[in-house]
Amino acid sequence: MIEYVRGIIEDIGQDYVVIDFMGIGIKVFVPFSTLKVLPSKGNITKLYTYLQVREDGFQIFGFKTKEELDLFEKLLSVSGVGPKGALSILSVVSIDNFVKAVNAGDYKALTVAPGIGKKTAERIILELKDKLPKEIVFEGDNNFSNEALEALLALGYTKSEAIYALADITCDSVEDAVKQALKKLMK
């Protein structure tokens, strides 16, 4: 529905920002991971969004990267996890640590998020284990993963963005891995 919102930051709260978009103030709920990388009030920002429509109104949830939005949507697909629970997880667990925890079956790493108990964490692991990337896969030398990761970090991407972009990529060289990852990040 609304792919993203770009505008001037008018207000910053504990779990939201208000973005002025053509004279309309849009309240966007964001995880702490997004909040800490936003520019200050008065600056322009772009957030990828998820629109939740309910009987009593609607809410917009925003994320600095498409990867965060994608993980948020995957979390919402888990029975018993709503937008606030998904935001809670994304606020305290990075994407790469989340993927590692789910693939390792480490429910304790997820229970650090407020409102996420043992049963919910176990359900998240059960339902998302096959929907998340396992790890970076290369056909040749395994040092490619580290070199490709370092290249993406040098280009200004965060570690979690770079790991997500390199996940499940099969290639023969560092150059191919970086090219494929950049294509994934540009989508």
Curated annotation (Swiss-Prot):
In terms of InterPro entries, this protein maps to:
DNA_helicase_Holl-junc_RuvA_I (IPR013849), Hlx-hairpin-Hlx_DNA-bd_motif (IPR003583), NA-bd_OB-fold (IPR012340), RuvA (IPR000085), RuvA_2-like (IPR010994), RuvA_C (IPR011114), RuvA_C_sf (IPR036267)
Q: Which Gene3D superfamilies match?
A: 5' to 3' exonuclease, C-terminal subdomain, DNA helicase RuvA subunit, C-terminal domain, Nucleic acid-binding proteins
Give this protein's Gene Ontology molecular function annotations.
ATP binding; four-way junction DNA binding; four-way junction helicase activity
Q: Where is this region: Domain II?
A: 65-136
Q: Does the keyword DNA damage apply?
A: yes
Superkingdom of origin:
Bacteria
Q: Which GO terms describe its biological process?
A: DNA recombination; DNA repair
Q: Which UniProt keywords apply?
A: Cytoplasm, DNA damage, DNA recombination, DNA repair, DNA-binding
What are the boundaries of the region Domain I? 1-64
Give me the ranges of the annotated region Flexible linker. 136-139
Q: Where is this region: Domain III?
A: 140-187
- Which protein is depicted? Holliday junction branch migration complex subunit RuvA
Q: Which organism is it from?
A: Thermoanaerobacter pseudethanolicus (strain ATCC 33223 / 39E) (Clostridium thermohydrosulfuricum)
The gene is ruvA
